[in-house]
Amino acid sequence: MEEFKRNLELDRSQQHDFIYPLIFQEYIYALAHDRGLNRSIFLENTGYDNKSSLLIVKRLITHLITQMYQQNRFLFSGNDSNQKKFFGDNTNLYSQMIFEGFAVVVEIPFYLRLLSFLEGKERVKSHNLRSIHSIFPFLEDKFSHLVYVLDILISHPIHLEIVVQTLRYWVKDASSLHLLRFFLHEYPIWNSLITPKKSSFSFSIRNQRFFLFLYNFHVCEYESIFVFLRNQSSHLRSISSETFLERISFYRKIELEVFAKDFKAILWVFKEPFLHYVRYRGKAILASKGTSLLMNKWKYYLVNFWQCYFYMWSQPRRIHINQLSNHSLDFLGYLSTVRLKPLMVRSQMIENSFLIENASKKFDTLMPITPMIGSLSKAKFCNVLGHPMSKPVWAALSDSDIIERFGRIYRNLSHYYSGSLKKMSLYRIKYILRLSCARTLARKHKSTVRAFLKRLGVGLLEEFFTEEEQVFYLTFAKASSNSGELYRRRVWYLDIICINDLANYE
């Protein structure tokens, strides 16, 4: 039993990082504020003082308290709304600096663990595994042999205090956790992470780093169950269920008699060796070679795990059981299916020959055209039916900038959907963007689309012909004499680490 406890701790007992003194490092706030939320902060410190300083933090907190007091005073006195807005903006500015600095500090222990994990490993390989496209070769290799899949939407915790309680097993620093708890209790708007509203969306964006840290940690805790089951699946048959209930950081010490009775009955679920798990953001996939009964057991276990450990009510509609042979998997912008491919094999035996018909499974990935047109419609490139429209907000730009923006959007889409089995949907997206670009230019110069297409001609076409397409045809044209075979080629890139919303191009 003692050996099992050590395995279940997942090396958390080695974490004794006291990060609270770093909160009073002046360069932390300068680095977090100057570099912004979307850049890496783990770089060498050049130009900042490494000595501890209470001055910068004291100033920030003093300004924050002062402005909050003045904001409340003006709020109840009914004075000019411009003054309230001015103080409110300053309050957000000071709070943003404090939250960004705190997020940087709390991330340090996790980053140190990442560095220790990467020591001795090939740097190129680790970067390749960061690519979103690296998931699809794995799916192609594994999912064609599986039968059922659990389509999971990861739930949010009921209250962010639960995240603080689980965070204390990783960060052995009570002072930092008290400060985190203070943030969550003093600013109720942080609960918008659970139920996002339009009124709090701007605040969430300004403190995006802190939101992402809390959510990623929550997902990391959720996924720790799969690491444990992977390591211990071959030893579960001889282990008593009481051992699981004694782990504080794995299951809360609960006295629910129903859960204790049912736990032994579902323990055999973990013996399944053909189990694969994939996640991106808030959506996860759990695929197995087992039966429908086995997948229902998994669904039952996950619901109990979320409710008893994370105190969250997992709705049944957040977990769907689907059969891969007759269900399209919507994941990472692709529609993935496992279809049967007939194969005729001729067998020769002395004087007789036989034709044997076999069916092999093949994993296909397709670009869904309907959601993509919906995204283009939301970004005002076309209407809901896919008819191209002009982009009035870009009419003030130069002609070269307009063409470059439209071309860049298509090149990014073509780069990402290069793994699609059929390229017809991608060609339709090219048509929409090219005509939308022409209509935007015609609107700017108060002319007709026909005149601009005649004027630009090949120039507009070249801007929408990607470098990947040129390399693609030069690479596979000689090896494929059949144009249909060339049309179905798939290419996965290992340099794609994020998916941007088309609306960001406003």
UniProtKB/Swiss-Prot annotation:
It comes from the Eukaryota. It is found in: Plastid, Chloroplast. Belongs to the intron maturase 2 family. MatK subfamily. The lineage of its organism: Eukaryota, Viridiplantae, Streptophyta, Embryophyta, Tracheophyta. It holds the Pfam family Intron_maturas2. This is Maturase K. InterPro entries: Domain_X, Maturase_MatK, Maturase_MatK_N. The gene is matK. Its main location: plastid. GO terms for molecular function: RNA binding. Disulfide bonds: none annotated. Usually encoded in the trnK tRNA gene intron. Probably assists in splicing its own and other chloroplast group II introns. GO terms for cellular component: chloroplast. Keywords: Chloroplast, mRNA processing, Plastid, RNA-binding, tRNA processing. GO terms for biological process: mRNA processing; RNA splicing; tRNA processing.
